[in-house]
């Protein structure tokens, strides 16, 4: 005898579900009802499990690839502009002007946008808008040699980069946790406290951070490849990069529902996501029930029940956003500001003054092949820094290392402050032993890159898998909700927690930009002061670069 058991899933935004128990349930959509056949052969069961596992891995790879490309493409133009700063400005104009135009608009986007947004994020429009702004900005830089127009173009690209980072971090919160899997074998509660819990949201953040780290290397390399063609042609070629970001969003990125369909029966029954309005409109081909643009384009509107015509609209008030912001300051935002303020002060204000006599083959065989003139020191420092930023930002995604636990997120800030103090005093007093001074500085810059990258990925990973964000995928009770009022309350709570999670990860994003902006204002006078102090003490190598 065949026993058929139907387990209902929670209704998902943008879909109309009809679940029936009995003979009719065996013909229902398998994406919305789990059917267990007790007479199924072991071989068929193993084959089904293998197929499901393969499908889930493929979908998970798509998610990881998409978010890696988002981080890479969104941040590459920022790096390209910084690398090409000297070629973009007339002679005699300080490169700090490019740095300011390249960071201040991004800070504005990250700091203000989450508070002006009302209701649910429209991700498709955001991605298209970011790509368009970047494209226009790069064309202005390419075809208008006037300083004012180039600064406008740089500012547009910067604003796009800041808004893009905010958008993709918020998008990551729309992906549900993975059952109870952990990297360490701990219970879910223990893993959450230690920052070890795995989730699709955590994977998305990890791979996005890895992409932003890779942008430092690939963006600089891209400019050096097109540089011989000149600013106009080179920048015009690189202006097509945002188009690949749209392709990654439209083609590679899976919907939330696709991830859950790829899981085994247990995983699919435990979690039901709140999808974005884009899932319903742009990926409607994968749904059995047709959706209309008007239904799904309503900002912050969710459907609350099978066959229900009622909608719930959710909008966070400014007071609610302020209440969500306050608990994020001490554990996340302030440490991130300090890390990046110290890090970029080292890179822009102190590192250019850490110049030493050229290494000889007898004393430093390897360095003597890399550093052939005094101007080679600073590019080497930047290459080492970017490499170790990439490695540390990839610690979760590629190297499968745990994130820094929430209660230890201040450690990178303390470490960066200590590194700044050490390198500042070395620049002033040259207290490192001469034979090891330059290799030791390189090692310390490696540590600086590791600390900064690990702080970035750990902060956003911690928020992505935070218990407070679980409203995005709530456990199913396995029972039909008969009372319409209770069902509406549940749907409203789900949608509100989803928006709260989006805001929480979005409001932290301005921390790194604020630190970088502060560092850019400090670094210009600091570099001049340090070099003058070295000259007064009889060391004039900084004047020769």
Swiss-Prot record:
<keyword id="KW-0926">Vacuole</keyword>
<comment type="similarity">
    <text>Belongs to the battenin family.</text>
</comment>
<dbReference type="InterPro" id="IPR003492">
    <property type="entry name" value="Battenin_disease_Cln3"/>
</dbReference>
<feature type="transmembrane region" description="Helical">
    <location>
        <begin position="97"/>
        <end position="117"/>
    </location>
</feature>
<feature type="transmembrane region" description="Helical">
    <location>
        <begin position="322"/>
        <end position="342"/>
    </location>
</feature>
<dbReference type="GO" id="GO:0006865">
    <property type="term" value="P:amino acid transport"/>
</dbReference>
<keyword id="KW-0813">Transport</keyword>
<feature type="transmembrane region" description="Helical">
    <location>
        <begin position="127"/>
        <end position="147"/>
    </location>
</feature>
<dbReference type="GO" id="GO:0005773">
    <property type="term" value="C:vacuole"/>
</dbReference>
<feature type="transmembrane region" description="Helical">
    <location>
        <begin position="234"/>
        <end position="254"/>
    </location>
</feature>
<keyword id="KW-0472">Membrane</keyword>
<keyword id="KW-0029">Amino-acid transport</keyword>
<feature type="transmembrane region" description="Helical">
    <location>
        <begin position="205"/>
        <end position="225"/>
    </location>
</feature>
<keyword id="KW-0812">Transmembrane</keyword>
<feature type="transmembrane region" description="Helical">
    <location>
        <begin position="66"/>
        <end position="86"/>
    </location>
</feature>
<feature type="region of interest" description="Disordered">
    <location>
        <begin position="23"/>
        <end position="49"/>
    </location>
</feature>
<dbReference type="GO" id="GO:0005774">
    <property type="term" value="C:vacuolar membrane"/>
</dbReference>
<feature type="compositionally biased region" description="Polar residues">
    <location>
        <begin position="34"/>
        <end position="49"/>
    </location>
</feature>
<keyword id="KW-1133">Transmembrane helix</keyword>
<protein>
    <recommendedName>
        <fullName>Protein BTN1</fullName>
    </recommendedName>
</protein>
<dbReference type="InterPro" id="IPR036259">
    <property type="entry name" value="MFS_trans_sf"/>
</dbReference>
<feature type="transmembrane region" description="Helical">
    <location>
        <begin position="440"/>
        <end position="460"/>
    </location>
</feature>
<dbReference type="Pfam" id="PF02487">
    <property type="entry name" value="CLN3"/>
</dbReference>
<dbReference type="GO" id="GO:0051453">
    <property type="term" value="P:regulation of intracellular pH"/>
</dbReference>
<feature type="region of interest" description="Disordered">
    <location>
        <begin position="276"/>
        <end position="304"/>
    </location>
</feature>
<feature type="transmembrane region" description="Helical">
    <location>
        <begin position="408"/>
        <end position="428"/>
    </location>
</feature>
<comment type="function">
    <text>Involved in vacuolar transport and vacuole pH homeostasis. Also required for cytokinesis.</text>
</comment>
